[in-house]
Amino acid sequence: MKYRLLPIIALISLAACCTKPGSETENTTPAENVPAAVSVPGFAKGADVSWVSEMEASGKTFKKADGTPADIFEVLKDCGLNSVRLRVWVNPTGGWSGKDDCVKLASRAAKAGLAVMIDFHYSDFFADPSRQTFPKDWEASKSDATAVAGLLKAHTSEVLEALKAEGVTPAWIQIGNETRNGFLWPLAQLWDNKGNISGGWARFAQLYGAGYAAAKAVCPQAVVMPHLNNAWEDNAWWFKELKAQGANFDAIALSHYPQTEIGKTAEQVNSSALSRIQSLAAAFGVPVYVAEVGVKPATESASAAVLKSFIDGALKIPACKGVFYWEPEVYGGWKPAVYGSLGWGSYDMGAFTSDGRPSSIMNAFK
C-alpha cells in the first residue's frame, strides 16, 4: 500500500535478535534508555504507523479514545494492539522512513511494549505493484544482479544492526513490499507488457535470497517473509515459483483492502481472503500474516463491521498469526509533504477522528 487517493508462530519466549547471556555487562547504554524485551504475540494485532514522525513534525498530536493526550504507541496499546509495522526506504526525501527514522520509531514502540515488524521496500519511496523503483544510490549497479545483491544485503544488515544497537528486537522482517511483479525494476522484474521477462524470476529469487540471508544472519529467530497484495486472490502459483527458485520463507505476508475491489462486496472479499489464507498455510506449511488492512472511514459504522468480521475470521484460523492496519493514525486530511508535488490526495483509510482519537473502526482489535 502506498496511498489511496481520496477516493504471525507459536509464542517465542526470546526476542528475535537476542543478546548473549551476560551481555548486559557489555552494554554501556543507560538501562532506562533500553527497551525491555518484548514477547512475540501469538496473534499480532498491529498497525503500520510509519508516517508518525512526519505527522508529529507537522504538528499532529494523538489522544486516547477518552480524549486523554498520549503518545501514539500508548494510544495503540489502548486500542488493544500489541505490534507495529515500520517501513524502511534506502535514501528517502527528508529522511522520512529512512533508517534513522525507522530506528527512532521502533525504539519508541519497543519501549511501549509493542513487538516490531520491519518492512524493507528496497527503494527510496513506496514500492508496490505499480512501482518498484531502484534506489538512486544503487543505480550505477542496476544491471549487475550480484552487485545489487551485495548492496541489498548490506542495507538490510545495516538497518537491523542499527535496531539491535538501540535494543530493538524485530519479530518479523519483510523482504520487499507487495512484490507480485518482483522488485528493483527492471533488474528483478518478473514480467512486462510483452510477457514474462527472461531470467526475471532467477534474479528476483537471488536478490530476495540475499535479503533473507542478511536478515537471518542478524536476527536468526525473526520470521522472515515475502509480501504480496490482494489476499483474496489465488496466490499459490507465486509462492510455488519462488520455492522452485530455491528461496526460503518462514511465513507469508499479504495485503487486504476489502472495500476496493470493483464488482465484489467487502463481505465477499473478506470471505475469499480468509479462504486463501487457509489454503496458502496448508500448501506451504507456514503461517500467514495480513501485513496490511484498511477500510474506509467515510462509512465508519459499516467499515468497522467489515474490519471486525475479518479479524474475527482470522482469529479462527490457527495458521493466521496476525493482522496489521495500514496507517490508521492519519486524520484531518493530513498527507506527506511530497504528496503535494505529486498531485496526490490524502490517504482515505485513516481510522482516527478529526481531533486525533481512534475511531470506532479501531475497536475491531479489542
PLM feature segments, named:
Residues 3-6, 14-36:
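Bacterial Sec-dependent N-terminal signal peptides
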Residues 35-72:
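Boundary/entry segment of secreted carbohydrate-active catalytic domains
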Residues 45-49, 84-86, 116-120, 171-175, ...:
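Hydrophobic faces of well-ordered beta-strands that scaffold small-molecule active sites
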Residues 57-61, 282, 298-313, 317-366:
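Aromatic-rich peripheral "rim/lid" segments of glycoside hydrolase catalytic domains that contact
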Residues 72-73, 221-223, 231-302, 312-315, ...:
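Glycoside hydrolase catalytic-domain groove-lining segments
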Residues 74-200, 204-224, 229:
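Substrate-binding cleft and catalytic face of glycoside hydrolase catalytic domains
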